[in-house]
A protein has these predicted regions:
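Membrane-interface amphipathic segments in extracytoplasmic regions
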Residues: 2-414
Length: 414
């Protein structure tokens, strides 16, 4: 006898669903086993799982830090950091403390004053900004006038031997102490023949320039008590000192402390010299540079130590390795997406003047050409990543102060 249609349907349906239920159960069991196997394999092969599931690694606890002051020291990879901060300001609609009027820095080499910031004196004495990162000579009470109380302060240091070599080539014709000497080795062999202490500020790039940028006396004798007291000052004022030689590890640490996303801290190397404008110092010259810049040498040694101690406190070695690997991988992806030939170009090869960095002295400062044919959104992302310091500052200035005359960067066209 044939069962009524409805019963048969229900019966058939029931057995169908029972079979399907079994299949679904199997599916989840297999998936669970697979996941366990991957985790086991990752453990055995010392692979960080976040490398396999990148979206997991981009999770951060709590809101991002948005009040940030970066002391932009000279010739220390600071333009690359500035690019990161300007991008963050622009994409998060944050205000930046930019140089007033037609200026390109915040009063450097004079000690910073709040009135060097555009708009600091408008809207009453309480006007505060989110991001501050243009060159200035650090002067905490004045910086505090334009930055909120909960600002995160950080800076970056570089081995003074290489920092001095970079300065020498870049500021060769600008700094009196460097003007009349053929090489840095010759300068370091008898610095007092070229360095006139009474010229003060104009020679700041020639000796202990990071110490000077921090607001201290770059000609002070490196006496133990004095050095220790100033290092303590820096520790009190800054939450973090990064190290240019370990730039990627620095970005991992910075991102963690600021609770930013990975893409916020991925950057291309900016303001780098082409290989033919880098000179090498003899081993004796290197030792003399450490002696000549003894204050910077102490500064660098001290904060190189604290940097690694901080990294160890924040991340296990394996986690650090995997985060650095992820950062590099993402940089490679973005280079392939944005850059012509995925690499930097020297000044004569850069076709768009808006992307050509400011050139100084004998240095050939490299930049980038973008790939042709990028869609609008990708183009915007890529342009931001390769935009040199002066152009980016002028761009933000126009966005922030549309009624003011724009910064005149026509000289970059030459
Ligand atoms: N990501 C990264 N890692 C390591 N080093 C880097 C990085 N980005 C820039 N650089 C090097 O930093 C030098 C430029 O420093 P600044 O941008 O601070 O110079 S400036 O004071 O703003 O003119 C310049 O050094 P030299 O090439 O020796 O002159 C750059 O090569």
């Amino acid at each position: 006898m044939e069962a009524p249609t409805g019963q048969r349907t229900v019966g058939a349906g029931h057995s169908y669903y029972t079979g399907a239920g079994r299949r679904i159960g199997c599916f989840w069991a297999v998936l669970l086993l697979l996941a366990l196997a991957v985790l086991l394999l990752a453990g055995v092969m010392h692979v960080d799982v976040r490398l396999l599931m990148p979206q997991l690694g981009d999770q951060v606890d709590g809101p991002p830090v948005t009040n940030v002051m970066f002391l932009k020291t000279h010739k220390t990879a600071s333009s690359t950091v500035l690019n990161i901060l300007f991008r963050f300001a622009e994409t998060h609609n944050l205000s930046a403390a930019l140089p007033a009027g037609g200026r390109f820095h915040l009063g450097y080499p004079w000690l910073f004053l709040a009135r060097y910031v555009e708009g600091a004196e408008q809207g009453g004495p309480e006007r505060r900004f989110n991001i501050m990162c243009n060159h200035l000579r650090f002067n905490p009470p004045e910086v505090q006038k334009v930055m909120p109380n909960d600002t995160f302060y950080f800076s970056i240091l570089r081995n003074p031997v290489f920092q001095l070599e970079s300065s020498f080539v870049y500021y060769k014709s600008h700094v009196p102490a460097f003007r009349n000497v053929t090489s840095l080795d010759a300068f370091l062999a008898s610095p007092w023949a070229y360095y006139n202490q009474s010229l003060g500020l104009s020679n700041a790039y020639a000796r202990n320039s990071m110490w000077f940028d921090l607001g201290f006396d770059n000609d002070a004798p490196p006496k133990e008590d004095y050095v220790r007291a100033r290092l303590l000052d820096v520790e009190r004022r800054f939450q973090l000192l990064l190290i240019a030689e370990h730039f990627d590890e620095s970005m991992v640490l910075l991102r963690r402390l600021l609770r930013w996303r990975l893409d916020d801290v991925v950057a291309f190397r900016l303001n780098a010299r082409s290989r033919h404008s880098v000179t090498s110092l003899s081993p004796a010259g290197q030792e003399r540079a450490k002696h000549w810049c003894a204050l910077d040498w102490r500064l660098y040694q001290h904060f190189n130590r604290t940097f690694w101690a901080r990294l160890r406190a924040e991340l296990s070695p394996r986690r650090l390795r995997s985060e650095v690997a992820r950062l590099r991988e993402r940089r490679r992806e973005l280079a392939a997406l944005c850059l012509q030939d995925s690499e930097p170009k020297n000044k004569s090869q850069i076709t768009d003047f808006r992307l050509r960095p400011y050139q100084s002295g004998r240095a050939d400062i490299m930049g980038y050409n973008l790939k042709p044919g990028l869609d609008n959104q990708t183009l915007q992302t890529c342009q931001r990543m390769v935009m040199p310091e002066l152009q980016y500052m002028a761009h933000l200035y126009t966005l922030q102060f549309p009624d003011k005359p724009p910064k005149n960067i026509a000289f970059l066209e030459a």
